[in-house]
Each structure stands twice: as structure tokens, then as C-alpha cells.
Curated annotation (Swiss-Prot):
CDD domains: homeodomain. This is Homeobox protein Wariai. GO terms for cellular component: nucleus. The lineage of its organism: Eukaryota, Amoebozoa, Evosea, Eumycetozoa, Dictyostelia. One of its GO terms (molecular function) is DNA binding. Keywords: ANK repeat, Developmental protein, DNA-binding, Homeobox, Nucleus, Repeat, Transcription, Transcription regulation. Residues 162-221 bind DNA. Residues 303-322 have a biased composition (Basic residues). Residues 291-302 have a biased composition (Gly residues).
Length: 803
């Protein structure tokens, strides 16, 4: 009797369906593919290879290639259907003849609408032959609901054009989608639309496919990083995910990848195995396909395209395609290794007992400690995949709990990095060493701390795991990685287990450096309370205060300053924490640092002070706050190593209001002008600065296009007398920036000739500001801008800016 291999619908770790006989298959077909339950057998055709059935007035002939009994039209039935009106015996003879002529058909539509009451289908009306029906199978959930409905109603439902029908993704579409997914896991709308047009799909279906594919990647293909800069040590060794996580079906006696693989192992148990097998690489060589899967006959004819298995069956003859290449070589070897293929078979609960039959003297028995070319063992794979029962049975069968792969990873590292706590406990109970590290120096405790697995870390520490072991790449300890990842409870656990809070890595960074970089206030507070060095200097000269000031973590900055951190330590570039805060325009951080006595006169290695940095990277408000702070002794004309003054940098950057403010602080335009001319800067800027130097107070008839504002006498008249003209009002707003350089006297301006002794002249303000936009925001202060627009202006008295 023919044997049909049912496709396993369970993945690794679940019971296998196994082989189903002819009678079992008929009952299966009756339950799932005949929802009306009116199945009859024709006793007059027992000599046929396949059973002939009358299903709701339809002659059926089951074929294993059609699991769901698709309905196919057969014109030969029409030759004898008219005889059904005579008597029941003639009808049976006609049906027998038709079934003998069409033995390979599955379900044939009966075109007779005039059957008498003696016919088997006296309660059903049939559709015409022109209505070709291909109903889809009904699930077991809807089986009970369909019992009370007629076949005709079910057929009409299938032909309903308004009913939504699922459209399967073709292998070609899957191939292209998978290729795009490997490059773009989150394609944008434009790319999804292009894919929809290219693949003849809807944009919504493409979006749903990528969502499902990302979910599959998260659940089944997650590749954990064991250390910073380390490769995917574990999963690269495991090989292809398709080979590890899928168990396809197969037709015939040899089986396919997975489902048929069980037949392969059964053949081994029954003694039908090759006597030339290698005991260290089980069933290697050319015989592996015959024993592990493929089509019928043990040769292997199953082609695994993603999750689709296609078995070739023509006229009830299995055509097997024998791939005589070992899985460890060629294209198959690139997808998954020999060990991974054996793992998915031998780790099945039904076959795990086979492992205890290992006999060193028997070349055909299996060595539980054998490894493939990548160093993979059964115990390592079981620990990685989370199979607790298999791990226990393997250890009981003599598997080494400390066995390593080619990268030095142990089963305990694999279980720790993925958070398989029961397996970690099981391995530790069987004397797995918690201090064994891989080739990069990663320990199980480091892996657990990186993944945030608190219970696993606690179990490892209870079994005397080394708390201060460092990695070989960057010398980090578990406390470093826990501080960087923000796992406060793990940090507390490590410190309670005598981990040093001031331990340094290969870059001289402490866990406090990591906490300050990432902004974890609670971890920083925990480390400081347990004696962390707040002035520790890393390889670049940075202290934790440098990093918190750079990142703008004000709470941590204040915490460090209140606990005695030094704000005046310079790094390798000469920067103090306040230099970084000014460069990143962190105004609140600068306030904290000034409050805790940060020195404002310190220069960087290239000679720049805080005003230089304010002009280049920050706003006018930052420069004002620094100039007006107590203890600021920065000169307005102070230059860096290249001879650049703040005024030169402000003019070059086009920061008009910064130029005005620096001039009000006594910055020399002559120095800036000489530098601009020397470097051949913008002619307009040079012309403006040059005109302010050479123009006298009596030059009211100048024809220069730039000098279009009244001289200093007219400006003083505008300030003292109201003017209703709109143009004069604009001049009034602009001239509110007129600064009086008399000794503390803000009521009366000095004569123009005495205001600037050599090189300064007031027309510069008007010319530059005249060319700027009237509503231009000149600082981050809202009140500053409001007063500027209202015409009240800003007056500067003896170097103090007053709103």
C-alpha cells in the first residue's frame, strides 16, 4: 500500500507527524477536504490504484500531489451522464467507466442537472460544466459551520467576485523582495511603490511583507554582538537561518529537508545506513543527501525555495534528482554546515535518545562531542537555541559542557548572551566554567551584562564568576558595559560583588566616563557614591566633566561640580569643560561652570579663548555672558596663534551684531582690517572697514554707495530730537547702537574727533546695520530682540550692556 509523507507543520522541538497510510489519508481527506461529509466509496472499482470516490455527485480520484482535492472538469463524464436518467444501475456503470478512463483526475464536475431520485446526489443541484470551480480548502476552525450548508452554496461563495481571495507571493517575487530586504530592512515609501509596480503587487502588500520579514528577523535571525567591534561569532558559525530553523516536507521515501530528514534518521536506526560513514562528521560525503532528505527513493528530489518544497511526480512515478554533493561543500555548504543539518534532526525530542547509543568502537555511532568544520557541536547549538531538554540529555550522554567552537565560544556564553536562564542554570549545575572566555576575551558574565540579563548575571556571580575580567579588544569590564548600556540594577549588583567603580579600560576610561557620555544620572550617582574618581583622565585627557559638558547633561554636570570635580582640567587639545560647553552653545551648562569658578581666561592649544569660540560656534548672548562675568579678563583684541581676533572672525562670518558688540568693548577695527586685506577677503567687508578708518567727521559729501548714513553730528541730533519720518525712524532704530565712550557719562556724547582716537568711527555701525534686515534676530534673547524692534535700543555704558 502506498505510503504518503505528510508535510510537518511543526518546527524543531515539536512532535513529528510521521508516515500516514492510505486509509489514514482518506480519513484526513474526508475531514478537511469534504466539508459536507457526504463521502462514498464505489465498490465496483476496487482494482484501481487510487480509490475512486463519489463526492457530492462528483467522481473523485485522490492524488498525493493535490492535498486539497481541487476540482477539475472532465468532458468524458458527459458521454455517460445521460444514462443516469434511466436507472441507478446504468448510472453506476457510467460512473465506473468514467473513473477508469480518468484515473488521474481528482474531482470531476458532473454536468447532469436532471438526475432522478435514485441518483446518489438527489438532494443537490449541479452547476453547468462551463462553470469551472476551484474551491480552496477550508480550515478546521470553519469545518463545523459548513456542515449545514449545501455544496452549491459553498461553490457560489467561491465564485463571489466581492469575496477577498488571498494571493500567494510567487518564488520570483520572494527572491527579489528578499534581495531588497538584505540591503534595506526599512524601505521608504518611494522604494515600496517601485517594488509594487515591479512585482505587480499593491504597495500595502509590499509593506506588510517587509513588516513580517522584520518580525521574522527579530525572532529567528537575531545576530547578537558579543563585544564592541566583535563579529557575529555565534551565528556566523551556525550558518544559514533557513537551515537551522525550518523543517520542510518531502515526498517519497527519502524525505525532504526536515520532515524527510526524520525518515533519514529512521533509516539509520533501522540499520539502512551507509557503512562508510565518518564517526566524527556523521553521514558526511555523498551519502548525506540520501539519509537526510530529498525526494523519494532516498536520492533527494526536494528543492527548498524559501519555505516552498516542490516534489516532482509525473504519472505516479517519482523523478528523483540526486545531488551527489556533501552539505559541507559547494552551494549547500555555504547555506548550512553538516553540524547544523544534523542538529535540526538529532535535537528533535523523538530522536534525542538516539544519542545515548554512542559507542567509540562503532564507526557509525555519533560522537556527542564531535564538531564540524566551524567548530559547532550539538551541545553548543542546543544551548544557543534554548533547548533545555536536549541540553540535559546531551550532558547526561557525556557532552562536554565547556566545549568551544572555532572562535572560543562556550555553550555558557551562547546561553548568556541570549538570556536562556534555565540552560545557564543547567550548565552551571554540571560544572560549566563561568570564567572561560572566547578569543576576544568575552566572558559569560560580560555577555549577560551587555544583554541586561540580571538573573543570569546573579547566577554567574553566585558560581564565582570573575567580576573584573577584561576583554582583549578594549579592556572593558562587565561594569563598563553595564554603565554604557544603562543597566542600573546590574551595576549595583556588580558593585555589591566588589567591582571597582574606578576601574579603567585600555583607553583609561572608567565606568563613570560611560555614564556621563550617555547621560545616565542614576548610574553616575551610584558610581560617585561608591568612590568613582571624578577627575579620572582618559587617553584624550577628558574627565567625566568634559564628557557631560560636551553632551549637555546638566544634571550630571551639576552633580559632578557639587561633589568636587575640577572644572579647570585641560585635555590634550587644551580644552576645559567650559570650552566644550561654549563650543556646543550649552548656555545652562556654561552658567553652572561659571558659578563653580571655572577660569575664563584659559586658552586652547591653538591660542583661542572663549570669545573666539563664542564668535565661531555660539550666539551673541554667549559672548555677552562671558564678557560680563566676574573674573573675565579677556581682551577684545586678543588674537590666537594665527593672529585672528574675535572682531576679525565676526566680520569674516558676517555676524553684524557681534561686530557691533565687540567694537563697543574696544576691539580695534584696524587690526581686523589689516588681516582682511592681507588674506584678500571680501572686498565689501574690506571697503566698509576701510571707510570707517579713513573717513573724517566732516566728510558729509561722500559719494560712496556704502556710506549712505549721516555723519556723527546728524546721528547725535537724531538721538536728541524726535523724528516722525519713516526713514528717520529707521535711522533712529539703527542709531540706537550708538555707544558713548565718555568716562561714565551717558548723557552727553564726546565730540566726534575725540570718540575714537585713531581708527574707530561711528558710521561703521550704521552702514553695516543698514544693510542687514530690520527684523533679523541677533541673539537668542527674546527680550533683547523685542527691545530692538520697539526702538528703545541698547545702550552701552563703560563696557556694560544694559537692556
Amino acid at each position: 500500500m502506498a505510503s504518503i509523507v505528510m508535510k510537518s507543520q511543526h518546527s524543531l522541538g515539536y512532535p513529528n507527524i510521521g508516515n500516514i497510510n492510505r486509509s489514514d489519508y482518506d480519513s484526513y481527506e474526508q475531514q478537511y477536504n469534504n466539508p459536507t461529509g457526504s463521502k462514498q466509496y464505489n465498490n465496483n472499482n476496487n482494482n484501481n490504484t487510487n480509490t475512486n470516490e463519489i463526492n457530492n455527485g462528483t467522481n473523485t480520484n485522490l492524488n498525493p500531489n493535490n492535498m486539497y482535492g481541487m476540482y477539475n472538469n472532465n468532458n468524458n463524464n458527459n458521454n455517460n451522464n445521460n444514462n443516469n436518467n434511466n436507472n441507478n444501475n446504468n448510472n453506476n456503470n457510467s460512473n465506473n467507466n468514467n473513473n477508469n478512463n480518468n484515473n488521474n483526475n481528482i474531482n470531476n464536475n458532473n454536468n447532469n442537472n436532471n438526475n432522478n431520485n435514485n441518483n446518489n446526489n438527489n438532494n443537490n443541484q449541479h452547476l453547468s460544466q462551463s462553470q469551472q470551480l476551484s474551491p480552496t480548502p477550508y480550515s478546521s476552525n470553519s469545518f463545523s459551520k459548513l456542515l449545514s450548508r449545501s455544496t452549491n452554496d459553498l461553490m457560489l461563495d467561491q465564485d463571489d467576485p466581492s469575496k477577498k481571495k488571498r494571493k500567494r507571493t510567487s518564488p520570483d517575487q520572494l527572491k527579489l523582495l528578499e534581495k531588497i530586504f538584505m540591503a534595506h530592512q526599512h524601505p521608504n515609501l518611494n522604494l515600496r511603490s517601485q517594488l509594487a509596480v515591479e512585482l505587480h503587487m499593491t504597495a500595502r502588500s509590499v509593506q506588510i511583507w517587509f513588516q513580517n520579514r522584520r518580525a521574522k528577523a527579530r525572532n529567528m535571525e537575531f545576530k547578537p554582538q558579543l563585544s564592541h567591534g566583535g563579529s557575529d561569532l555565534i551565528y556566523n558559525a551556525l550558518g544559514s537561518q533557513n537551515g537551522m530553523n525550518s523543517m520542510g516536507g518531502g515526498g517519497g521515501n527519502g524525505g525532504g529537508n526536515g520532515g524527510g530528514g526524520m525518515n533519514g534518521i529512521n533509516n539509520i536506526l533501522n540499520g539502512n545506513h551507509n557503512r562508510n560513514l565518518n564517526k566524527y562528521i556523521p553521514h558526511g560525503g555523498n551519502s548525506i543527501n540520501g539519509n537526510m532528505g530529498g525526494g523519494g527513493g532516498g536520492g533527494g528530489g526536494s528543492h527548498n525555495h524559501h519555505h516552498h518544497n516542490h516534489n516532482h511526480n509525473h504519472h505516479n512515478h517519482n523523478h528523483n534528482h540526486n545531488h551527489n554533493q556533501p552539505l559541507s561543500n559547494g552551494d549547500c555548504g555555504e547555506k548550512f554546515s553538516v553540524a547544523s543539518a544534523w542538529n535540526k534532526i538529532l535535537l528533535h525530542p523523538n530522536n534525542i535518545d538516539f544519542l545515548i547509543r554512542y559507542n567509540p568502537d562503532d564507526p557509525n555511532s555519533i560522537d556527542v562531542n564531535a564538531r564540524d568544520s566551524k567548530g559547532l557541536s550539538l551541545l553548543f547549538t542546543a544551548a544557543f537555541l534554548g533547548y533545555e531538554y536536549q541540553v540535559r540529555r546531551l550532558i547526561e550522554s557525556g557532552a562536554n559542557p565547556n566545549i568551544k567552537d572555532n572562535q572560543g565560544n562556550t555553550p555558557l556564553i551562547a546561553a548568556s548572551v541570549l538570556g536562556n536562564q534555565p540552560i545557564v542554570e543547567l550548565l552551571l549545575e554540571h560544572r560549566a566554567d563561568p570564567n572561560l572566555v572566547n578569543d576576544e576575551g568575552v566572558s559569560p558574565l560580560f555577555s549577560a551584562c551587555k544583554g541586561g540579563h540580571l538573573q543570569i548575571a546573579s547566577s554567574l556571580l553566585d558560581h564565582d564568576a570573575e567580576v573584573s575580567v577584561k576583554t582583549k579588544i578594549n579592556g572593558e569590564t562587565p561594569l563598563h558595559i553595564a554603565s554604557l548600556k544603562g543597566f542600573e540594577k546590574i551595576c549595583k549588583l556588580l558593585i555589591e560583588t566588589e567591582a571597582k567603580a574606578s576601574v579603567i579600560d585600555s583607553n583609561n576610561r572608567t565606568p563613570l566616563h560611560h555614564a556621563c557620555i550617555m547621560g545616565y544620572f542614576s548610574i553616575a550617582k551610584l558610581l560617585i557614591c561608591n568612590g568613582a574618581d571624578m577627575n579620572a583622565i582618559d587617553i584624550d585627557g577628558h574627565t567625566p566633566l568634559h564628557t557631560s559638558s560636551l553632551m549637555g547633561h546638566d544634571l550630571i554636570t551639576r552633580l559632578l561640580l557639587e561633589n568636587g570635580a575640577d572644572p579647570n582640567i585641560q585635555d590634550s587639545e587644551g580644552y576645559t569643560p567650559i570650552h566644550y560647553a561654549v563650543r556646543e552653545s550649552r548656555i545652562e551648562t556654561v552658567k553652572f561652570l561659571i558659578k563653580f569658578n571655572s577660569k575664563l581666561n584659559i586658552k586652547t592649544k591653538n591660542g583661542q579663548n572663549l570669545i573666539h569660540l563664542s564668535v565661531q560656534f555660539a550666539s551673541l548672548m554667549m559672548g555677552q555672558m562671558i564678557f560680563e562675568s566676574k573674573g573675565c579678563e579677556i581682551a577684545a583684541d586678543d588674537s590666537d596663534d594665527q593672529g585672528y581676533t574675535p572682531l576679525y572672525l565676526a566680520a569674516k562670518a558676517g555676524k553684524t551684531n557681534f561686530v557691533k558688540y565687540l567694537l563697543s568693548k574696544g576691539a580695534s577695527k584696524k587690526i581686523a582690517l589689516e588681516k582682511l586685506i592681507q588674506e584678500n577677503q571680501d572686498k565689501e567687508i574690506i571697503q566698509m572697514l576701510e571707510s570707517t578708518v579713513t573717513k573724517s567727521s566732516n566728510n558729509n559729501n561722500s559719494n560712496s554707495n556704502i556710506n549712505n548714513i549721516n555723519n556723527i553730528n546728524n546721528i547725535n541730533n537724531i538721538n536728541s530730537q524726535p523724528n516722525t519720518n519713516s526713514d528717520n525712524n529707521n535711522n533712529n532704530n539703527n542709531n540706537n547702537f550708538n555707544e558713548n565712550y565718555s568716562n561714565g557719562n551717558n548723557e552727553q556724547s564726546q565730540p566726534p574727533g575725540n570718540k575714537f582716537e585713531e581708527d574707530d568711527e561711528d558710521d561703521f555701525y550704521d552702514r553695516v546695520y543698514k544693510k542687514s534686515y530690520t527684523n533679523r534676530i541677533i541673539s537668542n534673547s527674546f527680550s533683547y530682540q523685542q527691545k530692538l524692534n520697539s526702538g528703545n535700543g541698547i545702550s552701552v555704558n563703560s563696557g556694560n550692556l544694559e537692556d
